[in-house]
C-alpha cells in the first residue's frame, strides 16, 4: 500500500521538505515522457532528493522546476544537455547561453543552491556550485513557487506552470 503522505499534494513552499521518493519522481517523469532515458531520470531524481536535503530545499519543487526549465530533459533552447544546467542558470541570449557544469551532480547542486537563494535566508551548507548565487538579492525573496513569477523567470505565469507540474506529480 502507498503511504498517505505519498498521495499528498507536494508543498509549494521552497524551504520545505519534498515528499516524493526518487521512484515516485521517476514514475511521474516517465509518465510525462515515456521515451526518456530512464537511467538518467533515475540518477537525477536521486540527486535532486539528496542535494535538496543537504540545503533544506523542497526536492519536489526543484525536480518540477528542472522539468519545466529543460522541457522534461528535451532541452532545445539556449541550454544543451552536455551543459548539465537543469534550471537555465545564466541563459539570457545567444551571447550568454548559460552556465556549464562538469557533472550532473554539480549542475543539480547549483540549481538547488540557486533555488535556496530565492526561497531561504539561510546560509549554504554545501560548497558553492552556483556561480550566480551572489546576484540573488535579497535572499529569500520568493518563499513559494508563485513568488518565482517575474523574478526567476520573466514569465508572469511561471509559478502557475510550476504548480501545474506539482499537481500532476501529486498522482505519483
Annotated model-derived regions:
Residues 1-172:
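Catalytic cores of secreted/periplasmic lytic hydrolases that degrade extracellular macromolecules
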Amino acid at each position: 500500500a502507498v503511504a498517505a503522505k505519498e498521495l499528498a499534494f507536494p508543498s509549494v513552499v521552497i524551504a520545505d521538505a519534498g515528499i516524493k521518493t526518487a521512484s515516485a519522481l521517476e514514475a511521474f517523469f516517465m509518465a510525462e515522457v515515456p521515451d526518456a532515458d530512464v537511467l538518467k531520470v533515475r540518477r537525477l531524481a536521486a540527486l535532486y532528493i539528496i542535494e535538496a536535503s543537504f540545503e533544506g530545499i523542497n526536492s519536489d519543487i526543484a525536480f518540477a522546476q528542472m522539468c519545466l526549465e529543460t522541457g522534461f530533459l528535451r532541452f532545445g533552447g539556449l541550454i544543451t544537455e552536455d551543459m548539465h544546467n537543469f534550471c537555465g542558470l545564466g541563459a539570457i541570449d545567444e551571447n550568454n547561453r548559460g552556465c556549464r557544469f562538469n557533472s550532473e551532480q554539480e549542475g543539480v547542486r547549483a540549481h538547488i543552491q540557486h533555488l535556496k537563494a530565492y526561497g531561504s535566508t539561510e546560509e549554504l551548507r554545501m560548497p558553492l556550485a552556483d556561480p550566480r548565487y551572489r546576484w540573488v538579492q535579497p535572499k529569500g525573496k520568493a518563499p513559494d513557487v508563485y513568488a518565482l513569477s517575474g523574478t526567476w523567470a520573466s514569465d508572469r505565469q511561471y509559478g502557475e506552470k510550476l504548480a501545474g507540474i506539482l499537481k500532476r506529480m501529486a498522482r505519483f
